[in-house]
Curated annotation (Swiss-Prot):
It is a multi-pass membrane protein. One of its GO terms (biological process) is symbiont-mediated perturbation of host programmed cell death. NCBIfam families: PRK12797.1, yscR. Keywords: Cell membrane, Hypersensitive response elicitation, Membrane, Transmembrane, Transmembrane helix. It is found in: Cell membrane. One of its GO terms (cellular component) is plasma membrane. Required for the secretion of harpin. Belongs to the FliP/MopC/SpaP family. This is Harpin secretion protein HrcR. Its main location: membrane.
Amino acid sequence: MNTEQFDPMTFALFLGALSLIPMLMIVCTCFLKISMVLLITRNAIGVQQVPPNMALYGIALAATLFVMAPVFNQMQQQFSQVPADLSSMDNLKTSVTNGVAPLQKFMTHNTDPDILIHLQENSVRMWPKEMSDSVNKDNLLLVIPAFVLSELQAGFKIGFLIYIPFIVIDLIVSNVLLALGMQMVAPMTLSLPLKMLLFVLINGWTRLLDGLFYSYL
């Protein structure tokens, strides 16, 4: 980082931007989708607090670091080649743009093109003409929200598929208890251990995380 000559206002903005890193870690990486799928899976099984939220977020963070490791490595190389220059706002903008290029490429690759086009059309309607005319599909102002929406949509699609077999187990257990005249027995009492057994037998956690990893190839 070049700090021999720097503008105080630029330096203050740079420090403020660093405080946004935790939020960017959520919205600009695979953390959002992975954490959503893990939480939905826990709810589908029926164990509301096992694993606890902190444990699931820790698993999601570890999985995110695994998936994003090549991207972070490329960003580190970019910043090493072109250190942040705080001498002016334009130089800082150029340094940051070059540094986040690998992350932007990752988000663009994993963004639904239809969502990106839709947001670009909305920008034409909502933004001033001189601003919307200068924005293309590679602009972070479009890529970040499009990526977030794509991750949300993909997470709910995966969650729906995860719910199906567990709902089938609930229905089967309920019908069997009804046929046996055991209406006083709560279906969850029997379906919960069956769902946990099924998930363990198919090595569910490993298969689930593998599927999430491969979705970013």
